[in-house]
Amino acid sequence: MFIGLFVLKVTFLNSRGDIQVPYRRLPKTDTARLKALKTLLDNNDTYTVRERFIDWKTINKAQPAYDKLLTASEQYKVNLKAQTRFTGKIDKLQKNAMMYISHFLQVLFLAVERGEIKRSCLTLYGLDEEASAVPHLKTIDGLLDWGQKIIAGEKARLKQGGRPIYNPTIGMVSTHYDIYCEAIERQRILQDRVNDSIEKLRLLRPAVDEVILDLWNQIEHHFVNEPPETRFNHCREYGIVYYYRRHEPHIY
């Protein structure tokens, strides 16, 4: 008869006479899952005919489970590292794009104040005719939205015969804006890869946990009649991890 899902009882008492039970717990992290499987797979006694007691079907499931989880875990780390590294670069590009758009708008407002550009032209940029302050550009959506409007507005005004704004020119604004847009798209692709990696890991874990649980049940069942002082050591050699509750003595 197989041992229960999580707890293996140990016979020793605390000061109140309660039975103390070190308990096993299925791994909570992918690193712990991989370690549990690798410990078993690296144990030569797992495979020898004389020593083997684990069902071959379960052993044959353990190696693919380990390989798939390891591959998915490593791919997640690679994708996360790439996404994190790129985030540092995009911050600078965002700052540059925001600075050029903000400076362009400030020059535009000054030209309106001096009467060099009609107030009615502000609507070409998506602005109210009475606008005199730079709109909010500190969010990604705000910067992308206003950048597009400002570039389109300046081009429309120039087509109507207006004089171009300098320092910065709309060409400089457009260049930094386009670079930022490309970076945002790249970041989204990298984030999608991270999300895909997370989803693959999420889908793999239940099957891996099922294999580990089956293995641990068979291992504990095999050593169930041995005394605790040897039973736990044997089980640990096959990858089972035991925990003690707070203030419990680490006897075995």
PLM segments and residue spans:
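Basic/polar low-complexity intrinsically disordered segments
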Residues: 2-252
